[in-house]
């Protein structure tokens, strides 16, 4: 029987810290949040492997390193209001809940949203607000957000998401074609000015919705 606590520590040491993640708050969050709670019980032994894993509905839970990297790119201090688009398993939302003050997350697939809510509730994450809907719309009624994290690959950066950012806020999103993307960080400055930084190449499931890919693409 695998010791999941030891497996989680080794995941952080070998996959996160060893690859250059230095943000202590991100490291502590990855050490704390039990990834195995967010996958099917039959896959618990693989929960801390260096890979994404299927969670049903043709969706995946992201590779731990990618979760840590994207979380760190938001540069959270603990006071922020954060929007996540694409709840999936709920694992990324749990990490954000450790790093920010409030988390708002949107999932288009109802069964995934319900499972994620159950997992988040079981761990006591009362600062996570989840709704079912088209995540590409964002969550305009709760804007502005200090940070927005998109967990699926988009064809381009949706400008209305930048509109939902507070001044100084950051949007992290994979942008590219349906098979390969680049991790992009947008920072919103005064008077609506934006700056863009491109990071590493990545592969995410498609961002499906009005401002993403169609489900038939």
Swiss-Prot record:
One GO biological process term? protein modification process
EC number(s) recorded for this UniProt protein = 2.1.1.77
Is the Transferase keyword given for this protein? yes
Q: Extract the InterPro entries matched here.
A: PCMT, SAM-dependent_MTases_sf
Q: Name the active site residues.
A: 62
Q: Which CDD domains match?
A: AdoMet_MTases
One GO CC term, this protein:
cytoplasm
Broad class of where this protein is predominantly found: cytoplasm
Q: Could you list the residue ranges forming a coiled coil in this record? A: none
Q: Which UniProt keywords apply?
A: Cytoplasm, Methyltransferase, S-adenosyl-L-methionine, Transferase
**What Gene3D superfamilies does the annotation carry?**
Vaccinia Virus protein VP39
- GO MF entries: protein-L-isoaspartate (D-aspartate) O-methyltransferase activity
Reactions catalysed: [protein]-L-isoaspartate + S-adenosyl-L-methionine = [protein]-L-isoaspartate alpha-methyl ester + S-adenosyl-L-homocysteine
Compartments where found:
Cytoplasm
Record function comment: Catalyzes the methyl esterification of L-isoaspartyl residues in peptides and proteins that result from spontaneous decomposition of normal L-aspartyl and L-asparaginyl residues. It plays a role in the repair and/or degradation of damaged proteins.
Record-stated family = Belongs to the methyltransferase superfamily. L-isoaspartyl/D-aspartyl protein methyltransferase family.
Record-given protein name: Protein-L-isoaspartate O-methyltransferase 2
Q: Which organism is it from?
A: Geotalea uraniireducens (strain Rf4) (Geobacter uraniireducens)
């Amino acid at each position: 029987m695998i010791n999941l606590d030891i497996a989680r520590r080794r995941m952080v040491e070998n996959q996160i810290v060893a690859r250059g993640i230095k943000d202590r708050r991100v490291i502590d969050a990855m050490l704390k949040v039990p990834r195995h709670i967010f996958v099917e019980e039959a896959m618990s032994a693989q929960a801390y492997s260096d890979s994404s894993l299927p969670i049903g509905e043709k969706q995946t839970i992201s590779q731990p390193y990618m979760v840590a990297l994207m979380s760190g790119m938001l540069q959270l201090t603990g006071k922020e209001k954060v929007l996540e688009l694409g709840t999936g398993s709920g694992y990324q939302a749990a990490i954000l809940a450790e790093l920010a003050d409030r988390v708002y997350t949107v999932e288009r697939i109802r069964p995934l949203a319900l499972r994620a809510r159950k997992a988040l509730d079981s761990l006591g994450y009362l600062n996570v607000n989840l709704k079912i809907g088209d995540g590409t719309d964002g969550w305009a009624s709760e804007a502005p957000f200090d940070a927005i994290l998109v967990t699926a690959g988009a064809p381009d950066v949706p400008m209305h998401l930048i509109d939902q950012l507070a001044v100084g806020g950051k949007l992290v999103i994979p942008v590219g074609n349906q098979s390969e993307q680049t991790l992009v960080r947008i920072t919103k400055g005064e008077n609506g000015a934006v700056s863009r930084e491109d990071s590493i190449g990545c592969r995410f499931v498609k961002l499906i919705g009005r401002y993403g890919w169609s489900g038939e693409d």
